[in-house]
Amino acid sequence: MISFLLCLAILIVGYFVYGKIVDNTFGPDDRETPAVRINDGVDYVVMPQWKLFLVQLLNIAGLGPIFGAMQGALWGPVVFLWITFGTIFAGGVHDYFSGMMSERNDGASIAEITGKYLGPVMQNVMRVFSVVLLIMVGTVFAVGPAGLIVELCSQSGASGVLTSLLFWLIIILVYYFIATFISIDAVIGKIYPIFGICLIIMAVGVIVGIFTNPAYTIPEIWDHFGSMHPSGTPIWSFMFITVACGAISGFHSTQSPLMARCMKSEKQGHFVFYGAMVCEGVIALIWAAAGCSLYEVTGGLNTGQIGRAHV
């Protein structure tokens, strides 16, 4: 448990110290942002900072720091180190610069920015790559929640269409299209902050539950500094690609332009982009700790056997 708290403290300190170094390196100033200068009422809309943060958090987080971190717990508490230092020195830097570069280029997408600096060939490559990536991620982020809703409905005694995976997939896809085609502050700006708060509350509830229940203990890094993977899978490089969201994910660069078009000031970038990534790192750290704590051994993540962690 001590190692978890240390990693949590390092993440928080990293936001204020290294995050500020990153911010100063970029050099935000008082120039007009795209949201103020363009302000078309659709994609370019000034939104309050707290809302920017929560929307950005949900855009980059979602299921990623939960599923990935829980799978990362298969390697044991050593995953805490990757989440902590990956977030501070890689993920936060990536998210900040991808968002601020977009802001400096009138809210351009990652493909457009790539084309500006690397030419039209790489721009088209990035466009294809982004579309394929977004389809894959969108599929997971549709099937995952739909499956959870079906499970909840089944457990509550519901039947018929409410327990149909296809039904909930259609509902989610309809929501996708509505949120995409109308003004960003009409749906995303109103609903996403609520979901973002729910994501944070859920993580806080998990860690409070672990701390207040003496039956569970978070194992220490120094007691298990090595791979605990039940299949003997090595830490390098499999743990690093398993835990992407929550440490570093290139996918975030496709999402950052959304909020880059809604900032009132460049000085909000530190909190919105770097801060949201640190918050995602904290969420991933909590779920990784839950994975290490709630299961008898790390193999329990595969078998579903819950018990007291070995420390």
For the regions a protein language model found, what residue spans apply to each?
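Helix-loop junctions at the membrane interface of multi-pass solute transporters
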Residues: 70-74, 98-102, 242-268, 272-277, ...
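Helix-loop-helix junctions that connect adjacent transmembrane segments
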Residues: 193-196, 202-253
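Membrane-water interface regions at transmembrane-helix termini and the short interhelical loops
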Residues: 101, 112, 143-156, 172-195
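Extracellular/periplasmic helix-exit of transmembrane alpha-helices
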Residues: 210-221, 276-308
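Transmembrane-helix boundary/entry motifs in multi-pass membrane transporters
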Residues: 38-51, 57, 103-134
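Membrane-interface "cap" regions at the ends of multi-pass membrane proteins
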Residues: 10-66, 268
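Extracellular loop-to-transmembrane helix junctions
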Residues: 2-19, 72-102, 111
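Hydrophobic alpha-helical segments and their helix-loop junctions in multi-pass secondary transporters
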Residues: 138-156, 163, 167, 180, ...
